[in-house]
Design a protein with these regions (language model features):
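Extended, charge-rich low-complexity regions and/or helical-solenoid scaffolds
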Residues: 1-134
Length: 134
């Protein structure tokens, strides 16, 4: 299931990039071309350029969100594996140093456990996880 969320964040980033590359720039080029051929100067095209940058900023937000999802998942997995490692290497139940280190990682361990035990939480996003047929 975690693989599906990583895949989702990857597809979200790819979608944001494709939107900028395939949609924003061609529309901008077309509008600027029409404006210049109709006699407007580049200074007159500020509104067109402003719309381009607004569209790019919106798409970059999606890409940043995708990166944050991926970063969060990787952090949770890292902390969970460290938690399990600390617990496995405890000398005894009263090893306070190990317990202190494990306690710091316990929150992410619990979050991952709840996430994996929910089972159907990915049903809401099922449409995003379908294989991409190119």
């Amino acid at each position: 299931m975690i693989h599906q969320y990583v895949l989702f964040s990857s597809r979200l980033a790819a979608y944001a990039y494709a939107q900028i590359h395939d949609e924003c720039w061609p529309v901008f080029d077309k509008r600027i071309g029409i404006a210049v051929t109709s006699g407007k100067t580049i200074d007159d095209c500020g509104q067109i350029t402003g719309r381009l940058f607004k569209n790019i900023a919106t798409r970059f937000f999606l890409e940043k969100r995708a990166a944050k999802i991926h970063e969060t998942i990787v952090g949770i997995l890292k902390n969970t594996s460290e938690y399990v490692g600390v617990i496995q290497n405890m000398k005894n139940e009263t090893d306070h140093v190990a317990l202190s280190r494990a306690f710091k990682k316990f929150h992410d361990f619990q979050a991952l456990k709840k996430f994996l035990l929910k089972g159907k939480c990915h049903e809401k996003f099922k449409v995003y996880f379908q294989p991409c047929h190119v």
